[in-house]
């Protein structure tokens, strides 16, 4: 049974007199900085001189420093830039400014778990991982609700790392919803598996395969799009609201019966075995090594695969059909 912490389990007094240096001002960074500040915590933002986020952070009222200046100022240093750049930022800007008693904070365990970043033993290392995009974390904080989060401690040099991490989570508003205790290992491996097998890799390729199957059988691409992609949101919303049981309760009996008899034919033993292999690649660090090598080589395969999928026929069909839906906000992807 999971250990879950709430407002009464966390004390913002553990952040009193401390400065949080938020390094990065993207999806998570802006929300962490604003929520902590609005909870009464002293916050500075660390961004490189050429960062496009500097003006945004300044307009939000923050003192913006270089990453190294912010790391020097911070008692708690939050590493909220993308995984693949964290090691470089740590070595160049953070490691030289670490002192006994400081706490290094993460929102994802990748670089600690896979040994990309190895902090000295006299600093605390913790993680608070809100389970939502940053804009939702911020919006729900403003509404006084909060989103669930995970909390973990990797090093407890001070003897207070857990209390400080829970205070940080409370400053984000997460203890209003509940904060689940975990480890860096568990968070990293389950997060990567979820992305690869279900949320991103699994769903996107299932959609494309369903679309291709219908179109190859002679059905109109527009109709195929609605059946395998557009209606997915309706189903996911039902699952999100009440679990698989609520989705099955809400759909037609025909759809529910098809779920039971045909679902196991799609997600069969071969697929489950493949999932186990994906998990093994994550657990052994094989995937991490592959992703690190891809970045060090300049991402040639990553960019090639991105372009290939952008050219999939489902994208052109989707662009045309979404133009028929004026209630949707137009989303432009930077080139």
UniProtKB/Swiss-Prot annotation:
SUPFAM superfamilies the UniProt entry points to: 6-phosphogluconate dehydrogenase C-terminal domain-like, NAD(P)-binding Rossmann-fold domains
Key word GTP-binding present: no
Domain KARI C-terminal knotted, residue spans: 183-328
Residue sites binding Mg(2+) 2 per the record: 191, 227, 231
Keyword tags: Amino-acid biosynthesis, Branched-chain amino acid biosynthesis, Magnesium, Metal-binding, NADP, Oxidoreductase
Pathway of action: Amino-acid biosynthesis; L-isoleucine biosynthesis; L-isoleucine from 2-oxobutanoate: step 2/4; Amino-acid biosynthesis; L-valine biosynthesis; L-valine from pyruvate: step 2/4
Catalytic activity: (2R)-2,3-dihydroxy-3-methylbutanoate + NADP(+) = (2S)-2-acetolactate + NADPH + H(+); (2R,3R)-2,3-dihydroxy-3-methylpentanoate + NADP(+) = (S)-2-ethyl-2-hydroxy-3-oxobutanoate + NADPH + H(+)
EC numbers: 1.1.1.86
Positions annotated to bind NADP(+): 25-28, 51, 53, 83-86, 134
Residues engaged in binding Mg(2+) 1: 191, 195
One MF annotation (Gene Ontology) recorded for this entry: ketol-acid reductoisomerase activity
Entry binding sites for substrate: 252
Signal peptide bounds: none
A GO CC annotation given for this chain: cytosol
Function: Involved in the biosynthesis of branched-chain amino acids (BCAA). Catalyzes an alkyl-migration followed by a ketol-acid reduction of (S)-2-acetolactate (S2AL) to yield (R)-2,3-dihydroxy-isovalerate. In the isomerase reaction, S2AL is rearranged via a Mg-dependent methyl migration to produce 3-hydroxy-3-methyl-2-ketobutyrate (HMKB). In the reductase reaction, this 2-ketoacid undergoes a metal-dependent reduction by NADPH to yield (R)-2,3-dihydroxy-isovalerate.
HAMAP family registered for this protein in UniProt: IlvC (MF_00435)
Family named by the database record: Belongs to the ketol-acid reductoisomerase family.
Protein name per Swiss-Prot or TrEMBL: Ketol-acid reductoisomerase (NADP(+))
Source species of the chain: Thermomicrobium roseum (strain ATCC 27502 / DSM 5159 / P-2)
Gene: ilvC
